Design a protein with these regions (language model features):
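The substrate-binding groove and active-site-proximal loops of carbohydrate-active enzymes
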Residues: 10-17, 52-65, 105-120, 141-148, ...
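Glycoside hydrolase catalytic-domain groove-lining segments
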Residues: 63-65, 70-71, 77-81, 85, ...
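Aromatic- and glycine-enriched glycan-recognition loops and surfaces
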Residues: 16-31, 56-77, 121
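Substrate-binding cleft and catalytic face of glycoside hydrolase catalytic domains
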Residues: 3-5, 36-53, 66-147
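Short, acidic/polar
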Residues: 16-32, 116-129, 174-183, 251-260
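Solvent-exposed loop/turn segments at secondary-structure junctions
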Residues: 10-15, 45-48, 89-91, 143-147, ...
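Active-site neighborhood of glycoside hydrolase catalytic domains
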Residues: 121-122, 137, 146-172
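Distinct, well-ordered alpha-helical segments
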Residues: 19, 95-96, 149-158, 173-189
Length: 274
């Protein structure tokens, strides 16, 4: 796998947001200012709460297929590699890592089975579209922490995706979650969200390395980044953090990330969060 110098561009865009010349201007600007060679588009799906079975990937909160195909072609025309990461979010604001149901079925409660049916339909829909678009890497979700122990369902989802898509398949676990995905063998590429404290980036990469070597898979940070706020270098993805803007603190975190990456060639790069 070629090293990724990427950006997650306009993730979870609602219907219409990726259409038109203005967004293409932003894509060109991103390419010019960052030197990125890869862009990740994150078409979204939504469910009402973390305990809701129904997943909607066709409504107003989601990107239309034709928009995604058009912005993908625009990125390719700029010489960018394009990955897709279809991702589900909760409309009530709960982080998707908390999506979960009882591990034993109860008649009057929501269940894993219908939820995974919907999630598999969501991923398989975009897998078929990715095949049409010639997408190099399809990342089957992000930070789905409380679902990851459902090994049988995840393997079935991956199998469904592979039935319509012959490109490489990845999964993006959360920070600190690299050791807890029991089905890494079913994907081609391992990925996680690299939101580690500024003084612990290197030690966490050293923790991850044996897992990657054992799996014999490429690994990269499908997300990484730090807020521009005092205190953010210790909790780089805590969007609730309150404080004064601090460009230097943000810069210090990015410099630490890049320095750690330069001395660890087994890490196949990162895609910064927009």
């Amino acid at each position: 796998m070629q090293t990724v110098h990427g950006i997650n561009f306009a993730p979870f865009s609602p219907r219409g947001a990726l259409a038109g010349e203005a967004v293409r201007d932003e894509l060109r600007r991103m390419r010019r200012l960052t030197g990125a060679d890869t862009v990740i588009f994150c078409p979204g799906a939504v469910q009402a709460t973390p305990f809701t079975e129904n997943i909607d990937f066709t409504g107003a909160h989601t990107t239309a297929d034709e928009e995604l195909l058009a912005i993908t072609q625009a990125a390719k025309d700029l010489g960018l590699r394009v990955f897709w990461k279809p991702t589900v979010n909760c409309l009530d604001g709960t982080w998707r890592a908390h999506i979960s149901f009882f591990d034993h079925d109860v008649p009057c409660e929501p269940k894993w089975g219908p939820w995974f049916d919907g999630y598999t339909a969501f991923q398989t829909h975009f897998a078929a579209l990715a095949q049409q678009a010639g997408i190099e890497l399809l990342i089957l979700g992000c930070e789905m922490t409380k679902t990851e122990h459902r090994e049988e369902e995840w393997r079935a989802c991956i199998s469904s995706v592979r039935s319509v898509y012959d490109g490489a398949v990845a999964y993006n676990c959360d920070k600190y979650g690299e050791a807890f995905v029991p089905w890494w063998d079913a994907v081609d590429v391992m990925a996680s969200s690299g939101y580690y404290p500024v003084d612990a980036i290197g030690e966490n990469l050293d923790r991850i390395r044996p897992l990657v070597e054992k799996a014999a898979k490429p690994f990269f940070f499908a997300e990484a980044g730090c807020m521009r706020m005092r205190g953010s270098a210790q909790v780089p993805n805590d969007w609730t953090l309150q404080g004064e803007p601090d460009d230097e603190e943000q810069n210090r975190w990015y410099q630490a990330l890049f320095a750690a990456m330069e001395t660890r060639p087994w890490l196949r790069g990162a895609a910064l969060w927009d």
